Amino acid sequence: MKIMVVYYSAYGHVHRLAEAVAEGASEIVDVEVVMRRVPETLPEALLKKIGVFEAQQAFAHVPVCEVAELETADAILFGTPARFGNMCGQMRSFLDATGGLWAKGALVGKVGSVFTSTGTQHGGQESTILSFHTTLLHHGMIIVGLPYTFQGQSRNDEITGCSPYGASTIAGSANDRWPTENELAGANFQGRHVACIAGKLFQ
């Protein structure tokens, strides 16, 4: 069984979550986990100006995803930073190129799940994931979130991401807050949970 983790990350926050998601999925027996980045759409000059180009070098080793690869997976976990309460433009551009897969129903019946990062505590974590689900539903995917059996999302002793819709983190307005132990645990749980659900469906 093959699980793909497909994401976009600017400063590395979503990348950290993606690693935790992949680790969780890989804990399930007979699961192949593949990590992929979606293509960058911003010009290099701008990326350098805002510090993204340098930050992305830390995970430049992760191969860029080809649209056709999605068809080979049994489950796909998508990671995106929030942009005004929606997925980022890079992810939107990538998904807009999946029309050919949609036309032949290539993703119908596959498991889909989403995780995210926002700049602020109420910066659109839930709306980003929920609006992302619309695209997955158009593809006929089976949506899996982060159930309350991950008890870390009920904590009130610290500021934390994660909701029943998916794992998340808060980067901070200066992008200087990194995923906490609890947020990474949520991402790990989500990866493992998706792999378990996919296993029940496809093995």
Curated annotation (Swiss-Prot):
SUPFAM superfamilies attached to this UniProt entry: Flavoproteins
Requisite cofactors: FMN
Entry binding sites for substrate: 102
Binding positions for FMN per the UniProt entry: 9-14, 82-84, 117-123, 138
KW Mitochondrion (keyword) present: no
Alphabetical UniProt keywords: Flavoprotein, FMN, NAD, NADP, Nucleotide-binding, Oxidoreductase
Catalytic activity: a quinone + NADH + H(+) = a quinol + NAD(+); a quinone + NADPH + H(+) = a quinol + NADP(+)
Positions with a binding annotation for NAD(+): 11
Presence of the UniProt keyword GTP-binding in the record: no
GO molecular function, a single term: flavin adenine dinucleotide binding
Domain Flavodoxin-like: residue ranges: 3-194
EC annotation from Swiss-Prot or TrEMBL: 1.6.5.2
Assigned GO CC terms: membrane
Cofactor binding notes: Binds 1 FMN per monomer.
Superkingdom of origin: Bacteria
PANTHER family: FLAVODOXIN-RELATED PROTEIN WRBA-RELATED, FLAVOPROTEIN-LIKE PROTEIN YCP4-RELATED
Family to which the UniProt record says this protein belongs: Belongs to the WrbA family.
HAMAP family in the record: NQOR
Name this polypeptide is given: NAD(P)H dehydrogenase (quinone)
Species assigned in the record: Syntrophus aciditrophicus (strain SB)
